């Protein structure tokens, strides 16, 4: 079996229009993060997102005379995190938990993409890019069981991963051949 680790929502900023009158028009898709075991690779630092402006005001950029970032945290925690406790006037700022960004949320607001000759539901490159960075290391193999237009294969190659894919639709398989033949493989 599989373990469901995340049910990520892809909230489409520009969904295909639907002429429906008995329900709301669909503007999202589910992306499932599955693992084969309870312990699995997840490289969250590879997919951090920038802090929002309110969080930027909340923390960071308060340095002492030695150039060390300062915080209002207690002295012990500040030292453990590598920050000085406060500046010379006794005031500090709360320092962001991770200076590289914050943990990505499970709702991704992204536009759909297009590829000449491809079907309507082309993922933006960002979706497989985030999944590949979060779950694999360079040289790993990425499996795409529903290749569509081959976006995951393209991103896997760009990120230094090998890939295998399955696509039953012959028209899409031709698109995949065209897209992947242009890639510089290992």
PLM features: what roles do these ranges have?
Residues 1-180, 185:
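Core catalytic lobe of class I
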């Amino acid at each position: 079996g599989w373990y469901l680790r995340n049910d990520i929502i892809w909230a489409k900023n520009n969904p295909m229009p639907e002429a429906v009158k008995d329900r709301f028009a669909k503007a999202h898709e589910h992306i499932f993060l599955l693992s084969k075991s309870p312990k699995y690779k997840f490289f969250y630092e590879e997919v951090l997102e920038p802090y929002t402006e309110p969080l930027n005001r909340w923390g960071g950029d308060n340095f002492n005379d030695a150039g060390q970032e300062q915080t209002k945290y207690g002295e012990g925690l500040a030292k453990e995190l590598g920050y000085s406790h406060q500046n010379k006037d006794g005031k500090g700022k709360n320092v962001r938990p991770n200076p590289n960004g914050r943990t990505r949320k499970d709702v991704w607001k992204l536009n759909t993409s297009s590829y000449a000759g491809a079907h309507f539901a082309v993922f933006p490159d960002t979706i497989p890019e985030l999944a590949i960075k979060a779950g694999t290391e360079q040289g790993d193999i990425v499996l795409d069981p529903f290749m569509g237009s081959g976006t995951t294969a393209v991103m896997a190659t760009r990120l230094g991963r090998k890939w295998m894919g399955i696509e039953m639709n012959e028209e899409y398989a031709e698109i995949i051949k065209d897209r992947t033949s242009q890639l510089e493989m290992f």
